[in-house]
Amino acid sequence: MSRPSTPLLDKAPTPDRLRALPEQDLPQLAEELRTELIDAVSTTGGHLGAGLGVVELTVALHHVFNTPYDRIIWDVGHQAYPHKILTGRRDRIRTLRQAGGLSGFTKRAESEYDPFGAAHSSTSISAGLGMAVASELSGEKRNVIAVIGDGSMSAGMAYEAMNNAGALDARLIVILNDNDMSIAPPTGAMSAYLARLVSGRTYRSVREAAKQVAQKLPKFLQDKARKSEEYARAFFTGGTLFEELGFYYVGPIDGHNLDHLLPVLKNVRDTQKGPVLIHVVTQKGKGYAPAEAAADKYHGVNKFDVITGKQAKPPANAPSYTKIFGTSLIEEARHDDKIVAVTAAMPTGTGLDLFGEAFPKRVFDVGIAEQHAVTFAAGLASEGYKPFCAIYSTFLQRGYDQVVHDVSIQNLPVRFPIDRAGLVGADGPTHAGSFDTGFLAALPGFVVMAASDEAELRHMVRTAAEYDEGPISFRYPRGDGVGVDLPERGSVLEIGKGRIVREGTKVALLSFGTRLQECLAAAEELGAAGLSTTVADARFAKPLDHDLIRRLVREHEVLVMVEEGAVGGFSSHVLQFLATDGLLDRGLKVRALMLPDIYQDHGKPDAMYAEAGLDRTGIVRTVFAALHRDELGHEALPTPFRA
């Protein structure tokens, strides 16, 4: 299928060329950019809806501002695909989220037009404020623009940054991309006129002059004059909250109308003094009918047919871990009316949408607010409820102080289902679930589990529901299960007890998590090479199964720990126990396999695990090396001494 014709876009591969185009050509350029975006994402998959919603805004920003000298920071980065196309990366846009290709988010190492990396929400205003202050300290006059969605404004960090920006009176532009119309809709021509008026040099100059006059009046009259101006402007334009935080508010304006966007951006660029917030209203999926009709389904997409909008979906061999968690929690909630669920703006991603359908009054979506989610769950637990606070591994990092201070120190029985544990593939290092085992197992009294398959996950949901002695977590990966038989309801596991899955005599593989299947495959290969191999499923990183570990040490020559986490996790706890228990004093050969001490770039999960040595081949190679055998399993001959 041939690619769409884009004559204007072909002339503007970089922002300097874009700025050379006359303004009357920009609407056509925007349409060509939208067409190119749809065509590209149809072949790669990725985040579509958000990018379609900011096409005109992206064109306007790069036309008005002198990028890359002026800084544009895209919050989260889902909406940055049009930005990538316009900033010299169009020739690689069809490598999005593929190994060796473009990142799905902004990335400093990728382009000078990406001044700050993103993927987690609500960081843009803080980063932008730092850049704005650095610019002032350096005597620069650059503009710094942070583009943040209304969803990201539910996180406290955004308001912390705005409060600080207002106090510093910094030269910072924040563009609020309101694509859910959750704050206020634009009201047509009058709204556009007012936005252009209040953002302009004349209005703001008169306003400043009036302030100077007011300073000569008694203080109570100064206050009345200031409040009168603010109230009058707020009445017509909204934005009182942002004014109270110290921002000059402009909007709301139609984010798809370049005739409205361009003059406002120019006014703010030319007259900016102190922080300014421009409220832009957009539509997710704008310009592509299937995405406009179902914005939630086109936020993140698989490859799809451009004509029909139908997404390609590979057949599943088993239910996903996320679905198993959701259905298992529903089953437990039927037996226990104290079970409730908490999510931080990810009900579908965590499987709690299913729970919400079954128990709508027992699920709580708190928005993008992981810190609040954790402490909210702690409050529920303190009153005798059984909260399951379901958060992706990478996002739980955002609420770690609350996990420590509000949950762990008080020993409150909050349950933490940790989705997206391990490598997540196309979303790369910003979304990898690498660190949760290490940072949770470091906490006294915290029970830390990992499911090796979907049946084990069902058992762990039941175990967590029954456990009231303190906080407990269980981790599981993205994607489909391995296809094991599922019990109708999980069983309660004995805390701190693992299991032997395969018996052997010479080599022991101790797995924590879903690398168990690779361990079993490696055991087959090792057995064929004459190395009888035991495979154990640890189940718990804390408390460790000391009896199981002692048995593996006593009965085997080699012990290999295998996990889908970073340095400092399960293997570190096992090694510490081996050392303190004197189990390393007997000539045991011990090896630890975990994620490498780097941030792995995006790619396909299987290839990434192979790169990390966490597949069958890597495990076998590690055992052979420990026993000084070559790749065929033969004992390596000693190197002859040469004088």
Swiss-Prot record:
Cofactor(s) named in the record: Mg(2+); thiamine diphosphate
Subunit structure as annotated in this protein's UniProt entry: Homodimer.
Pathway note: Metabolic intermediate biosynthesis; 1-deoxy-D-xylulose 5-phosphate biosynthesis; 1-deoxy-D-xylulose 5-phosphate from D-glyceraldehyde 3-phosphate and pyruvate: step 1/1
Coiled coil: none
EC main group: transferase
Enzyme Commission (EC) number: 2.2.1.7
Reported function: Catalyzes the acyloin condensation reaction between C atoms 2 and 3 of pyruvate and glyceraldehyde 3-phosphate to yield 1-deoxy-D-xylulose-5-phosphate (DXP).
GO biological process: 1-deoxy-D-xylulose 5-phosphate biosynthetic process; glyceraldehyde-3-phosphate metabolic process; terpenoid biosynthetic process; thiamine biosynthetic process
Sequence positions that bind Mg(2+): 150, 179
Reactions mediated catalytically: D-glyceraldehyde 3-phosphate + pyruvate + H(+) = 1-deoxy-D-xylulose 5-phosphate + CO2
Domain of life: Bacteria
SUPFAM superfamilies: Thiamin diphosphate-binding fold (THDP-binding) (SSF52518), TK C-terminal domain-like (SSF52922)
Record's cofactor remark: Binds 1 Mg(2+) ion per subunit. Binds 1 thiamine pyrophosphate per subunit.
InterPro entries: Dxylulose-5-P_synthase (IPR005477), THDP-binding (IPR029061), Transketo_C/PFOR_II (IPR009014), Transketolase-like_Pyr-bd (IPR005475), Transketolase_BS (IPR020826), Transketolase_C (IPR033248), Transketolase_CS (IPR049557)
This protein's name: 1-deoxy-D-xylulose-5-phosphate synthase
Keywords assigned: Isoprene biosynthesis, Magnesium, Metal-binding, Thiamine biosynthesis, Thiamine pyrophosphate, Transferase
Similarity field: Belongs to the transketolase family. DXPS subfamily.
Binding-site positions, thiamine diphosphate: 78, 119-121, 151-152, 179, 288, 370
GO molecular function: 1-deoxy-D-xylulose-5-phosphate synthase activity; magnesium ion binding; thiamine pyrophosphate binding
